[in-house]
C-alpha cells in the first residue's frame, strides 16, 4: 500500500485542490453556495438554467449528513457510538455502504485508514477549533478503542464491540456524499457540473464545449488563494487531505488534525497535503488520507 501511495504522489500532486478556476464566468450556467458539512459547498451546473435542481442536491446533502455525522444527535453514527459494547444498531443502507467501504480501506491500508479513530479525534479536540495535547495516560486509555476489526457490519445493522468506541466517517463521508449528489444530478439530466464540497471536488463530464474543467491547486505553504498548479480533468474526482486545514499550537509547536491510529499523534511523514485524482470521490477521500498517513 505504501508503494502504491508513492506512485500516486508522483503521478499526481502533493498539493491541495481548492476549486475550479473560472467556473462561475461561463455563460449558460447556474450555481449556488451553502454552508454545509462544516465547509462552503458550491454546485455549478453548466448548460443548465433551472437552479432548483441544485436545491435538490442540497437536500440530499442534508439527508446524508443527518445519517453519517457522528455529532448529530439521532444519526446512525451517533446511535452506533451510544450503543457501543451494548447492542446492535439499525442503520440505513447508505450508512451500511459507507461502513463497508471503510472496512475495505482499513484492510487495504493495513490499518492506517481506520474510522474507529473517533475517540482519538475527540481526545485531541482539534476539530472544534480548540485542541488538547493528551497525556500518555490518556493515549494509553484511548488507543485500544481504535480497531475496525471490532466494527461489525451486517445487512441493515452495525455494532461496535467495546464500550467507548466511536466510528467517525470524517475521512470518507464527504467523498461518499459527493458521489451520491452526482448520481442525483445525472438522474435529473445534468451532463456538465462541478460539485465542490470544500477540498472534495467532483466533476460531471467536462465543459459543454468539450474542454476539461480546470481545478486550481492551492500551495499548502502559502496563504489561501495562492495556486501552485492546476489540474485539467473531466468526469473525475479531485480530493485533497492536508495537515494545514485544522491545527492548534501547544508549547510553541503546531499539531494538525490528521491523526495516526497507531501512535495516537498527528501524522509526521513530511507531506503537507495529498491530492488524489480518481473515478469516484469516496475512493479519493479514503486514499488521500491514507497516503498522507503513510507518506511517500
Language-model features, listed with the residues they occupy:
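Mature catalytic core of soluble alpha/beta enzymes
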Residues: 2-296
Amino acid at each position: 500500500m505504501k508503494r502504491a501511495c508513492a506512485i500516486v504522489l508522483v503521478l499526481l500532486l502533493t498539493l491541495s485542490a481548492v476549486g475550479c478556476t473560472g467556473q462561475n464566468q461561463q455563460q449558460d450556467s447556474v450555481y449556488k453556495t451553502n454552508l454545509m458539512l462544516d465547509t462552503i459547498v458550491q454546485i455549478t451546473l453548466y448548460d443548465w438554467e433551472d437552479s432548483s435542481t441544485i436545491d435538490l442536491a442540497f437536500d440530499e446533502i442534508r439527508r446524508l449528513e443527518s445519517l453519517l455525522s457522528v455529532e448529530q444527535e439521532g444519526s446512525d453514527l451517533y446511535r452506533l457510538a451510544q450503543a457501543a459494547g451494548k447492542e446492535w444498531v439499525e442503520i440505513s443502507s447508505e450508512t451500511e455502504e459507507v461502513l463497508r467501504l471503510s472496512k475495505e480501506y482499513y484492510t487495504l491500508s493495513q490499518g492506517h485508514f481506520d474510522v474507529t479513530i473517533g475517540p482519538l479525534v475527540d481526545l485531541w479536540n482539534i476539530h472544534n477549533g480548540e485542541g488538547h495535547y493528551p497525556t500518555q495516560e490518556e493515549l494509553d486509555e484511548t488507543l485500544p478503542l481504535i480497531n475496525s476489526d471490532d466494527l461489525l457490519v451486517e445487512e441493515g445493522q452495525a455494532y461496535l464491540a467495546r464500550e467507548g468506541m466511536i466510528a467517525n466517517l470524517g475521512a470518507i463521508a464527504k467523498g461518499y456524499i459527493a458521489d451520491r449528489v452526482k448520481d442525483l444530478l445525472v438522474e435529473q439530466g445534468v451532463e456538465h457540473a462541478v460539485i465542490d464540497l470544500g477540498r472534495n471536488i467532483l466533476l460531471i463530464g467536462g465543459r459543454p464545449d468539450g474542454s476539461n474543467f480546470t481545478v486550481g491547486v492551492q500551495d499548502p505553504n502559502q496563504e489561501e488563494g495562492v495556486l501552485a498548479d492546476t489540474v485539467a480533468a473531466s468526469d473525475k474526482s479531485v480530493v485533497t487531505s492536508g495537515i494545514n486545514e485544522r491545527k492548534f499550537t501547544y508549547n510553541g509547536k503546531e499539531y494538525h488534525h490528521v491523526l495516526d491510529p497507531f501512535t495516537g499523534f498527528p501524522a509526521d511523514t513530511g507531506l503537507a497535503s495529498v491530492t488524489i485524482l480518481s473515478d469516484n470521490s469516496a475512493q479519493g477521500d479514503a486514499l488521500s488520507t491514507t497516503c498522507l498517513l503513510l507518506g511517500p
